[in-house]
Each structure stands twice: as C-alpha cells, then as structure tokens.
C-alpha cells in the first residue's frame, strides 16, 4: 500500500469528525480526491464519485464520522500515531480502515475501470448516530444499484445479514401519594412488572444467521423524592430485530402485553439480509471468505438493494479506548475488494 494512504488515514484521525460534525474531514477527503484527479461530488458532508460504465452498478460505502472518544484513552484519540505496523486513534478501525481500503481500490479503478461495471464510491456522514444527513442524501442521486458493499470492521468476514434496531421509550402512569400511607398507584411497580413481561417474552421466529430477536431494558427513571409514590416511570428498551419481524410488527406484538405506553423513536432501521445465492455472496464463498450475521447496525439498513458488510479491522475494537488498525489488515482488504469486484 502506498504511503500516501497511511498519511491520509493519519490526517483523517487528526481531524475530529464526531457524528454531525464531519465538515472538516469531508473537506479534507474532497480536496484529496480532487488532487488525485477524481471528479468528486458533495452533498452536505457526504462525498461520491463514480467510474466505469455498463449495465451493472456497484456501490462502495464507508462512513467518515466517529463516536465521541472514550474517557479511558491512554493515547491521544486524535493523534494518528503510526509505529510502522499499526495506526492508532479514534476512527482508525471504525471506519477509517474501510475508507482507506475503498479509496485505494477506487483510485485504481478510476484509472482502469472494470468493463461492464459502474462503480460508485460513497463516503458518508452520520452513520454512528443513525442520522438522516448521511447516505440517504445520496441515494436519490445515484439511482438503481445492483449490489452494495458496506465497509465496516468485520475481520474480513462477510456479513450477509445484520440486526435491525428499534428503541422504545416506555412510560408507566400511576397516581402520586404519600409513601407513609396506603395511597397512590406506584408507577415504578407498573413499569417493573412490564419490564419483567418484556424480559420473559419469547419471539417464535429464529433467523439462521441472526438467531432470536434480542430485547434489553437499558434505562429507567422514576420519582422525585423518597416520600412520594411516583406517578410516572420512564424506561428504555433496546431491541435488535432478526429480519423475520419488522420493527412495526415487533411494536404491535409488545404493546398489548404491557400497561405502559411503548413509543418507538424510529421504525426505519429494520434488519436486513441478502440471499446466499446472490452473486456477490457466491463470489465471497469462492474466495473462501467466511459468512456470518452481524449484531451491529450499519448503513446496510438504509439500502434496498442486495448488500453485504465487509472490511478491515475488528468490530470488538470499535468505540473502545486506544482504537487501532493494523496496516496489513487494510492491505488484505484492498486485495479482497478488488477480487470481489472482478
């Protein structure tokens, strides 16, 4: 891999790009691509470019935003240090490795396109916060896509399925009263009963790649002082769907089971899967790339075409202190991306 890509990844890390604040890193990449002679377009803090022509359109996507740095960092999260084999810093693994690998492949294809294929590279914002100013801004411009590769740290295994996400805000209503007397209706107890009901609920349908729907209560809040029976209790439920139920179906199943009101923050991030017989998956199998179902959400959820998730790095490093990626992981990804696109 040319040293210019290592330097670019260091510069990306050194340019803070927390979700919703990607302007500077987007400008950095836009200018870099222009210097490389690529005709790049920008919408908001999203970039896209294309090369080649033909009946088949392939989308490459990686995201340029990051989460906020963990307080546990021992290195400078924006340092972009390189020791010769490893690059450290926020976003190195998620998703800088995929950005660099896809860029390197695209630069080569821009100079020598694959006959019969139109390749579109998209570098997009607001993936980490599931915002609406990311890849969704570009899709109407791009048009029909035959298949997509979403670059994420997958240990160079291919995710052919991905869990969806729905967050429910639960609210139990009771009646305030004095805690010293037998009065009032305790909203906290109502919420606890409902949380137990949700905890015990079993979804019947099991996905071969994703397993059962996973449902976890993650937050609860009630009461204002020790001697008042709380009249309201709020809680949050994180639901990871498995593709056999839509988020709307899950909500419709759960609401009648509880007294609390369950309000979805959004139902748009459904689970996704791509049939094994799809050409890109068959190509991966022929190359010996392992297939799996991913528990984590990505831009796959926002694409309606056949899509897979594949890239350098390890998902277990994402959102952790002292994030890093090995240079040879990026180099392997470049080789495999090229082989997948042939």
Walk through the language-model features, giving the residues of each.
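N-terminal helical capping/dimerization or prosegment-like subdomains
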Residues: 1-69, 232-236, 250-253, 327-341
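Buried hydrophobic packing segments
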Residues: 29, 99-109, 138, 191-194, ...
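A structural signal for short hydrophobic beta-strand segments in well-ordered beta-sheet cores
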Residues: 40, 80-82, 217-220
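A generic beta-sheet turn/junction motif
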Residues: 42-44, 51-53, 163, 174, ...
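Active-site metal-coordination/substrate-binding segment of hydrolases
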Residues: 57-120
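Hydrophobic/aromatic beta-strand patches that form the interior of the parallel beta-sheet core
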Residues: 58-60, 122, 149, 308-310
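Acidic/histidine-rich catalytic neighborhood of metal-dependent amide-processing enzymes
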Residues: 95-167, 171
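Metal-dependent amide/peptide-bond hydrolase catalytic core
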Residues: 160, 169-342
């Amino acid at each position: 891999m040319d040293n210019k890509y290592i330097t670019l990844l260091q510069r990306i890390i050194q340019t803070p790009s927390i979700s919703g604040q990607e302007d500077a890193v987007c400008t950095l990449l836009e200018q870099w691509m222009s210097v490389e002679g690529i005709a790049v377009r920008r919408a908001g803090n999203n970039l896209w470019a294309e090369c080649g022509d033909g009946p088949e359109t392939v989308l490459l996507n990686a995201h340029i935003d990051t989460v906020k740095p963990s307080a546990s960092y021992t290195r400078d999260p924006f340092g972009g240090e390189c020791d010769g084999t490893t690059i450290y810093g926020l976003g190195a693994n998620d998703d800088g490795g995929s950005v660099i690998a896809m860029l390197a492949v695209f630069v080569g294809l821009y100079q020598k396109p694959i006959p019969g294929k139109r390749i579109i590279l998209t570098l997009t914002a607001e993936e980490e916060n599931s915002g609406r100013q990311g890849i969704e801004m570009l899709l109407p411009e791009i048009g029909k896509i035959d298949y997509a590769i979403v670059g994420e740290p997958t240990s160079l295994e291919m995710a052919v399925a991905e869990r969806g996400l729905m967050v429910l805000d639960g609210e139990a209503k009771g009646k305030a009263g004095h805690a010293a007397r037998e009065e009032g209706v305790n909203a906290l107890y109502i919420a606890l009963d409902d949380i137990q009901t949700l905890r015990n609920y079993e979804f019947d349908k099991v996905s071969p790649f994703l397993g059962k729907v996973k449902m976890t209560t993650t937050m609860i809040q009630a009461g204002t002082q020790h001697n008042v029976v709380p009249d309201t209790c709020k809680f949050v439920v994180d639901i990871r769907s498995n593709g056999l139920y839509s988020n709307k179906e899950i909500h419709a199943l759960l609401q009648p089971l509880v007294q609390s009101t369950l309000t979805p923050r959004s139902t748009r991030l459904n689970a996704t899967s791509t049939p094994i017989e799809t050409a890109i998956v068959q190509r991966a199998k022929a190359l010996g790339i392992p297939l799996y179902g991913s528990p984590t959400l990505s831009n796959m959820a926002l694409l309606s075409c056949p899509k897979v998730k594949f890239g350098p790095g390890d998902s277990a490093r994402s959102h952790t202190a002292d994030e890093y990626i090995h240079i040879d992981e990026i180099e392997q990804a470049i080789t495999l991306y090229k082989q997948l696109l042939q």
